[in-house]
Regions:
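Structured core of small recognition/catalytic domains
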Residues: 230-291, 295-306, 318
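A short beta-strand-loop-beta hairpin characteristic of the jelly-roll/cupin
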Residues: 68-100, 110, 275-303, 314
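Short, structured motif recognition centered on aromatic/hydrophobic residues
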Residues: 57, 64, 79, 83, ...
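C-terminal functional regions that serve as terminal interaction/effector modules
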Residues: 281-284, 297, 301-321, 326-358
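Conserved short histidine dyad/triad with adjacent acidic residue
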Residues: 41-48, 58-74, 241-248, 260-277, ...
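Conserved metal-binding segment of the jelly-roll/cupin
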Residues: 65, 91, 98-118, 127-130, ...
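A short, N-terminal "cap"/entry segment at the start of jelly-roll beta-barrel domains
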Residues: 1-55, 139-257, 343-347, 352-359
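Hydrophobic, ordered structural segments
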Residues: 98-161, 338-340
Length: 359
């Protein structure tokens, strides 16, 4: 007779096998586009439904035709990044405008709908933890309205945008002109610290901790030297929603808990990023071509592809072997940090702290 304990043992073995033999690359050219009551075109990039073992998380890509809108629905937290098109979203009754490069946060169970008011399709990537929400029986997916063609008075019906922030003070929308250049800010901090020391006023600069209650001092050099003294991990880092791996605790006013589109990483031609090991994260390739090494295996990518770091201690780094810059969008999920705080062995490990040139 098979017992529940036998089932747990079998599930444990299957989970280990799944992450040890997990795919790491989703090709944008191979997506299976579908139509739903909510979306005209949507495809799963990374998720259990397309063969990636995740922590109940997913990354999708969707398209809104010109002059149309999505359905209106409610569900758990969502992070979105607009790739093309112009329009606005109505979230809990308030309008938030968007354009290419805008990052949006949908709070837990907020009513929301997206309107393409431009003359070209609007494309965006979306990250959620829907499978996790439903597994713990706290999440819901409530369809309130179906997709359709915009009304002729769509622009006036919802009024003008009055703020990028919700009534409770949290940020909902962030435009490219408001991205924070983390490397530039660290250089400014470094210069200020050097100037202060030269005038005899310095007491040492220790930078920021991550502001999330995690211990990141496990051989990564952050605790001793701080952000002001460490060389750069990428050619450029732009802070969007901020995250638990950032050298800064800056969140740009977002209050994401379950999912965040944290940063844009830029690698200059013929360079590679820092090398490290941690559990689940995702990258979406915005621009350029290159490759990632995940547990020693090479995965070549181009714009539109996505990289999955599976939920085990996975060593990885990213390479730009081209003559043009690359930009990738980093996505993290709160469930990762819940488990990292529980399990002492699952802290982030740095193998090489800085980006460097390649042949």
């Amino acid at each position: 007779m098979t017992t529940f304990y036998d089932g747990w043992l079998a599930a444990s073995a299957n989970a280990q096998k799944a992450v040890e033999h997990a795919p790491a690359l989703a090709k944008g050219s191979d997506l299976n586009w579908i139509e739903t009551p909510q979306d005209y075109r949507i495809a799963m990039l990374i998720g259990e439904q397309v063969g990636f073992p995740t922590m109940g998380t997913s990354l999708m890509k969707a398209e809104i035709p010109a002059g149309h809108h999505t359905g209106k629905h409610q569900h758990g937290e969502e992070a979105m990044h607009m790739l093309s098109g112009t329009g606005f979203s109505v979230i809990d009754g308030r309008r938030y405008d968007w354009k290419p490069g805008t990052t949006l946060h949908i709070p837990f169970m907020s009513e929301h709908q997206h309107f393409n008011t431009g003359d070209e399709p609007a494309l965006y990537v979306s990250a959620m933890s829907m499978d996790l929400d439903l597994f713990v029986h706290l999440g819901r997916l409530v369809q309130l309205e179906e997709k359709g063609k915009n009304a002729t008075d769509v622009e006036s019906r919802f009024g003008k945008e009055t703020s990028q922030f919700a009534d409770d003070g949290r940020r909902i929308a962030l435009h490219p002109e408001d991205w924070i250049d983390e490397n530039a800010r660290r250089e400014a901090q470094r210069a200020a610290a050097a100037s202060s020391a030269a005038h005899g006023n310095g007491h040492g600069h220790h930078g920021h901790d991550h502001g999330h209650g995690h211990d990141h001092g496990h051989g990564d050099g952050h605790g001793e030297h701080g952000a002001g003294h460490q060389a750069h991990r990428h050619g450029a880092i732009y802070i969007l929603m901020g995250g638990s791996e950032s050298l800064s605790d800056e969140t740009n006013g977002f209050q994401a808990k379950a999912v965040a589109i944290t940063n844009i990483f830029e690698e200059t031609p013929k360079t590679r990023s820092h090398s490290h090991t941690h559990t689940e994260a995702m990258l979406y390739v915005l621009e350029g071509s290159g490759y990632s090494e995940v547990d020693g295996k090479r995965y070549d990518w181009v714009a539109g592809d996505a990289v999955h770091v599976p939920p085990k201690m996975t060593m990885h780094e990213h390479f730009n072997n081209s003559e043009q810059r690359t930009r990738t969008l980093r996505i993290e999920f709160g469930i990762r940090y819940f488990y990292e705080a529980l399990w002492k062995g699952f802290h982030k490990v740095e193998h090489r702290l800085t980006a460097e040139a390649i042949a």
